[in-house]
Amino acid sequence: MLRKRLQAGLCSLLLVLVLVFGPMERAIAFTDEQDLLLQAWRYVSQAYVDETFNHQNWWLIRQKFLKRPLKTRDEAYEAVGEMLALLDDPYTRLLRPEQYRSLKVSTSGELSGVGLQINVNPEVDVLEVILPLPGSPAEAAGIEAKDQILAIDGIDTRNIGLEEAAARMRGKKGSTVSLTVKSPKTDTVRTVKVTRDTIALNPVYDKLDEKNGEKVGYIRLNQFSANAKTEIIKSLNQLQKQGADRYVLDLRNNPGGLLQAGIEIARLWLDQETIVYTVNRQGIFESYSAVGQPLTDAPLVVLVNQATASASEILAGALQDNGRAMLVGEKTFGKGLIQSLFELPDGAGMAVTVAKYETPLHHDINKLGIMPDEVVPQEPIGYAMMGSETDLQYQAALDLLTQDQAIAQISQAS
């Protein structure tokens, strides 16, 4: 009898607990700003590559930030930014609506802006010019590689992220933007007004060259955009018709772009080999391989430098590790992390590091880069000089491609 009473009492207690606490949990209503914060938290919780979240209790971080009185959307964005900063991962970041749209546009094929490739120099934490695009307003304004962009329309670039800086330089065709530029060559600072124009993002430039009686096809890939593979195929077909039987693929100053574009372009050169391994948060490897016959098996040299990054390194690493090409130039940037884009309810977005990658020979190049087969140091040069007689790295590639011994080495490796 006592046992039955205890069981009945326990059931009553459980019922009271359910009645008291259940409705309270269901009654919690989050504001729109809290919902945005929660969605950002969930994306990281579900997809981030590091399950320790930089050795932190991610649930407690959620609770901490939910206690904030987030009254405006800007306050919500600031909270999300602070939350993501705790991961100590510069590639996992919030993209406000204009930044998110800008990032998607930059891989689509056309935009309106000043035509600068930019990056943040980690050594001095300053916005730095990789190169102005050929024929762009920035090039016409005299902006050069390695110039530092200190301010955009008076806004200090140290206080804004890379995407926001890019978004502020884009705008309606015919409008102007004021750039405060410091030249490391002369240590002078000047303010330049640049008129925005339509920037055609054709990611590929090609030409036929000749050395020692051999016809060499030169292909420069500036970015791994959605149309990059199609443009590479066009260039290869055109150069083959012109008689090219060996190639230089120029990946210098290519900051990367779409991972899938890098894999698809590697398949144009490889035959059944592994292109890249990705490693997720559980440590599970997934491989991407070439399928079918390559578009060409002609000898290939790839040019790389310190601004060759991300998807460019995937392609360069695949070609080098499989013995398909020799790399010439300087050690690459060393970005071996993969990000996915996630959209937030209000049109903002997030880039979240979801995996790391390794080359076919399982080299982890993050923060290490890829060392070329032949190191040729060279100061940064503009697009107009790339692939010219004064381009030392290009000339070294031509020498390799027109020497019988080097060609035999490349062909044997292939």
Curated annotation (Swiss-Prot):
<keyword id="KW-0732">Signal</keyword>
<comment type="function">
    <text>Cleavage of the 16 C-terminal residues from the D1 precursor of photosystem II (PSII). This proteolytic processing is necessary to allow the light-driven assembly of the oxygen-evolving cluster (a tetranuclear manganese), which is responsible for photosynthetic water oxidation.</text>
</comment>
<dbReference type="Pfam" id="PF00595">
    <property type="entry name" value="PDZ"/>
</dbReference>
<dbReference type="InterPro" id="IPR001478">
    <property type="entry name" value="PDZ"/>
</dbReference>
<dbReference type="GO" id="GO:0031979">
    <property type="term" value="C:plasma membrane-derived thylakoid lumen"/>
</dbReference>
<comment type="similarity">
    <text>Belongs to the peptidase S41A family.</text>
</comment>
<dbReference type="GO" id="GO:0006508">
    <property type="term" value="P:proteolysis"/>
</dbReference>
<protein>
    <recommendedName>
        <fullName>Carboxyl-terminal-processing protease</fullName>
        <ecNumber>3.4.21.102</ecNumber>
    </recommendedName>
</protein>
<keyword id="KW-0720">Serine protease</keyword>
<feature type="active site" description="Charge relay system">
    <location>
        <position position="321"/>
    </location>
</feature>
<dbReference type="InterPro" id="IPR005151">
    <property type="entry name" value="Tail-specific_protease"/>
</dbReference>
<dbReference type="InterPro" id="IPR054621">
    <property type="entry name" value="Cterm_S41_CtpA"/>
</dbReference>
<dbReference type="InterPro" id="IPR029045">
    <property type="entry name" value="ClpP/crotonase-like_dom_sf"/>
</dbReference>
<feature type="signal peptide">
    <location>
        <begin position="1"/>
        <end position="29"/>
    </location>
</feature>
<dbReference type="InterPro" id="IPR036034">
    <property type="entry name" value="PDZ_sf"/>
</dbReference>
<keyword id="KW-0793">Thylakoid</keyword>
<dbReference type="GO" id="GO:0004252">
    <property type="term" value="F:serine-type endopeptidase activity"/>
</dbReference>
<keyword id="KW-0645">Protease</keyword>
<keyword id="KW-0378">Hydrolase</keyword>
<feature type="domain" description="PDZ">
    <location>
        <begin position="100"/>
        <end position="184"/>
    </location>
</feature>
<dbReference type="GO" id="GO:0007165">
    <property type="term" value="P:signal transduction"/>
</dbReference>
<feature type="active site" description="Charge relay system">
    <location>
        <position position="335"/>
    </location>
</feature>
<dbReference type="GO" id="GO:0030288">
    <property type="term" value="C:outer membrane-bounded periplasmic space"/>
</dbReference>
<dbReference type="Pfam" id="PF03572">
    <property type="entry name" value="Peptidase_S41"/>
</dbReference>
<feature type="active site" description="Charge relay system">
    <location>
        <position position="310"/>
    </location>
</feature>
<dbReference type="InterPro" id="IPR004447">
    <property type="entry name" value="Peptidase_S41A"/>
</dbReference>
